[in-house]
Regions:
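Extracytoplasmic/lumenal domain signature
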Residues: 1-330
Length: 330
């Protein structure tokens, strides 16, 4: 949902930056002790201590576009070349498997520990915690979208075949809904079970859990950013037209905030309702719930990475300048 129970920083103070050797499009995930895990196009997964020093790195032999996932002290990371790795918290390999097709979709872990992820070979996969492929569901085009899973275990995701899919936990199709453009953005599920999905037709779609369309909202360009939903049910989404849109649960526009670049970074909402997101104008933005500008932080490159809110009012994100940034209180 992009919603956090933690507070974000109230200023743009740089705590530290950590340099990798290539673009960082991946977003950060944190474990219980605050270690930050993030991938880089330099082919390494990095484990960074909360003070910004390296804990370890692991060479996975191919660029990392997707965001890692953590469950039960295991880190799962997907490589562009179709390899999936499971590492322990010390960076030791537990297993790796190869699927056909490149992976830019980020793995999502269900309540019982199974992994769900898409591939450029048109499939969405369900993989056990031991690395066994349990099933693969065929779409008609690339699956770059990362799935979302509801409380019943239904799996929602989009495909470049312009469809939003809902699957049962056993991989059987519940329904699909057609959009007017390819889908690379990932869905979000609202507090009432509504599924929100952006598409390259420039629309944000709101669907009921049975697949019926509730409404859509039209932006001026395609949507690669995934929506975030506040606890009140307000929806925030970025568009390639450079604006962040805030909509109420009925799809009525509350406000827009214009940046000077494409927005593919997905917003993060903190416990106060403040919204954080990156733009191709090289800035990370912080806005209040009513769309008021709070602060921005400028990096040396386009920001496609989505911000992650950690403890101690710190935000972590990557930039195409090759750095991972920690913004927070001194």
């Amino acid at each position: 949902t992009g919603r956090s129970t933690l507070q974000g920083p109230d200023s743009n103070n740089l705590k530290w930056s950590f340099h990798t050797e290539n673009i960082v499009d991946s977003s950060a995930v944190l474990d219980h002790d605050g270690t930050i895990y993030i991938g880089s196009q330099d082919k390494r997964l990095y484990a960074i201590k909360p003070d910004g020093t390296l804990k370890w790195s692991y060479d996975i032999g191919s660029k990392i576009f997707s965001t890692p996932a953590i469950s039960k002290n295991v880190i799962y990371v997907c490589a562009w070349n179709g390899r999936i790795f499971a590492l322990d918290l010390d960076g030791k390999l537990k297993w790796k498997i190869q699927i056909k097709g490149r992976i830019s979709s980020s793995p999502v872990i269900s309540a019982n520990g199974n992994l769900f992820l898409g591939s450029d070979n048109y499939y969405l996969y369900k993989i056990s915690p031991a690395g066994k492929i349990l099933w693969a569901f065929a779409t008609r085009k690339y699956v770059d979208s990362s799935p979302a899973i509801d409380n019943e275990g239904t799996v929602y995701f989009g495909s470049n075949d312009s469809r939003i899919y809902a699957l049962n936990p056993d991989g059987k199709l519940k329904w699909h809904s057609k959009t007017k453009g390819q889908i690379t953005s990932s869905p979000a599920i609202g507090p009432d079970g509504t599924i929100y999905q952006g598409s390259n037709d420039g629309r944000l779609y709101a669907l009921n859990p049975d697949g019926k369309q509730k409404w859509y909202f039209q932006t001026k360009k395609w949507i690669d950013s995934s929506p975030a939903v506040s606890k009140e049910g307000n929806v925030y989404v970025g568009s390639n037209d450079g604006s962040l849109y805030a909509l109420n649960p009925d799809g009525i526009l509350k406000w827009t905030f214009k940046t000077n670049g494409v927005i593919t970074s997905s917003p993060a909402i903190d416990s106060d309702g403040n919204i954080y997101f990156g733009s191709w104008d090289k800035k990370l933005y912080a806005l209040s719930p009513d769309g008021t500008f709070l602060w921005s932080f400028t990096t040396g490159g386009v920001i496609r990475s989505s911000p992650t809110i950690g403890p101690d009012r710190t935000i972590y994100f990557g930039s195409s300048d090759g750095n991972v940034y920690a913004i927070g209180e001194k």
